[in-house]
């Protein structure tokens, strides 16, 4: 029994290491972007593409990788993707440090990392749904999101520390972390054997169409809520990284620590939320709406705040909001379909999240040039609209009614569940 618990714990550690690697891909580079801009003589738009290209490539690769993960196995996809991720970091690092025309090669390395990233976080979500059930699944998904958040917390600090040695050193850290995750995944993740052969691609596609026909309205709303959190998060980090150096003359480890504050709050909130929500879908919806309301209030208030301490204090409210939204959205989406198509549906969610990350820095870069108050009021408007959409389009039964559904299947019409179970 003790051995089983220990193995279970190491399985969770192994799964958690996968999205942690994923978050390093962008967050670890954010503190060094101003230095990269000056060293490689780049424009603000060019340096923002270092984040955007990685995320865009990942977004388009994820649905393909998700299908392959459903077709074969999660581990068969995750491990090669982690190898590719590390190799892309090596290419970008050598290019930045030793190539004359470094920028195109850095971008090529980031593109390779994007393809590798496609097989990390989203597949880890599907794997969690495969291995854990019920309230334990929600708790582990909360841990996965917390691991994602912890990666965001640690990576600006790690990036800043490595940059004290050499600014492009962060690229060489990627393969080191990837090797650790590969070893953990190989040893501790034991997938269950498939009970039946995967369906032909035509039948698979038909099943997906059925899922989106029945669940599409709320599913895409949930996708949008998750993407909005990541869009605003990375946009704000991009803005804050630039402002800390230019306005407040803050760089190095101190800058990394400041960037880590809102991320740490989001991480703690994500873990707490995931451990409390269980399978209470009505509670999940309320927390998503509350989280988006917190984000709206925070961003609207930031348009009037100049003082750095007060700015970070108010920004923390938006981090609490993101920490409420993301674990609930994860649980909704992971439970939306059965195992056979879970990889694709969670991967599509991963694509949308990556698109949010991809467009955050360039859009915030443009908004920064336009108007600072206008930038914050615009994103406050976005989070408000998304919150209203969640209230209108995601329908769940109350908790006491969910119990009755077990006795009366006719009541299950609007409850979120796999389409194939209907």
From Swiss-Prot:
SUPFAM superfamilies (UniProt xref): MFS general substrate transporter
Organism: Bacillus subtilis (strain 168)
Single biological process term from Gene Ontology: transmembrane transport
Keywords, comma-separated and alphabetical: Cell membrane, Membrane, Transmembrane, Transmembrane helix, Transport
Feature: compositional bias, Basic and acidic residues: 401-410
GO molecular function terms listed in the Swiss-Prot or TrEMBL record: transmembrane transporter activity
InterPro entries listed in its UniProt record: MFS, MFS_dom, MFS_Efflux_Transporters, MFS_trans_sf, Tet-R_TetA/multi-R_MdtG-like
Protein name per Swiss-Prot or TrEMBL: Uncharacterized MFS-type transporter YitG
Positions of region (Disordered): 401-422
PANTHER family assigned to the protein according to its UniProt record, in alphabetical order: CHLORAMPHENICOL EFFLUX PUMP RV0191, PURINE EFFLUX PUMP PBUE
Residue ranges crossing the lipid bilayer per the database entry: 12-32, 49-69, 76-96, 169-189, 218-238, 257-277, 287-307, 309-329, 344-364, 374-394
Main location group: membrane
